[in-house]
UniProtKB/Swiss-Prot annotation:
InterPro entries: HIV-1_Nef_core_sf, HIV_Nef. Its main location: host cell. It is found in: Host cell membrane. The keyword Ribonucleoprotein does not apply. One of its GO terms (molecular function) is GTP binding. Coiled coil: none annotated. The N-terminal domain is composed of the N-myristoyl glycine and of a cluster of positively charged amino acids. It is required for inner plasma membrane targeting of Nef. This is Protein Nef.
Length: 263
């Protein structure tokens, strides 16, 4: 019952990179070289043209931003709420882009160090996240993809808060986020503005940076998020509460957290 649909969904769900590219935009460094063949085909298949993209700035809401230390669920109830929010926030168009089964194909399990490494290399071999612009929507698509296809509970994908390189806070995940310079021509040219995702992605980031995923195998044996920014791990960092607050304040993160609480 429903076998044909399930098989079709599984086949479509196999190309995560295509799903992410369909969500919006293109990889950096290719604006002047032309769109990738796979992306062009995906646009044609979906029946959507570049005119659907907009230069209007997307309003940033810190309460929705994923890459902050206060976004990491601390309790089982918070985890359930986080997962439900991920599901509620992704609309019908996202479901079509992801193309995965409605229910997890395997039993749910927590992300582990070994599993994170395995998934990082698996995604890289399948085309990877390399160079794909990061935004909140693609963050949720990746969460949902790994939850439905691999049964991984979506409470693991957190990155350091920036500015600058955002390191994964889950040890073993080998994809970091790096700031990408957008050329002045792309910033100012109205035509390019319509097709270049960097024109809107910078509004998703509190520091105004455009971010892209980058594979870093060194993250398998160097916990850079903890080494560089232990304060973002709170009480787990081993730092005193006063030192944690001092470091977060110096980086402007406590101010962001306070603004979130009052908004």
């Amino acid at each position: 019952m429903g076998g044909a649909i399930s098989k079709k969904q599984y086949k479509r769900g196999g190309n995560l990179r295509e799903r992410l590219l369909q969500a919006r935009g293109e990889t950096y460094g290719r604006l002047w070289e032309g769109l990738e063949e796979g992306y062009s085909q995906s646009l044609g298949a979906s029946g959507k043209g570049l005119s659907s993209l907009s230069c209007e700035p997307q309003k940033y809401s810190e309460g929705q931003y994923m890459n902050t230390p206060w976004r990491n669920p601390a309790t089982e109830r918070a985890k359930l709420g986080y997962r439900q929010q991920n599901m509620d926030d992704v609309d019908d168009e996202d479901d079509d882009l992801i193309g995965v089964s409605v229910h997890p194909r395997v039993p749910l399990r927590a992300m582990t160090y070994k599993l994170a490494i395995d998934m990082s290399h698996f995604i890289k071999e399948k085309g990877g996240l390399e160079g794909i612009y990061y935004n909140e929507r693609r963050h949720r698509i990746l969460d949902m993809y790994l939850e439905k296809e691999e049964g991984i509970i979506p409470d693991w994908q957190n990155y350091t808060s920036g500015p600058g390189i955002r390191y994964p806070m889950h040890y073993g995940w080998l994809w970091k986020l790096v700031p990408v310079d957008v050329s002045d021509e792309a910033q100012e040219d109205e035509t390019h503005c319509l097709v270049h995702p960097a024109q809107t992605y910078q509004w998703d980031d509190p520091w105004g940076e455009v971010l892209a995923w980058k594979f870093d195998p060194e993250l398998a044996y160097s916990y850079k998020a903890f080494i560089k920014y232990p304060e973002e791990f709170g009480s787990k960092s081993g730092l005193s509460e006063e030192e944690v607050k001092r470091r977060l304040t110096a980086r402007g993160l406590l101010k962001m957290a306070d603004k979130k609480e009052t908004s």
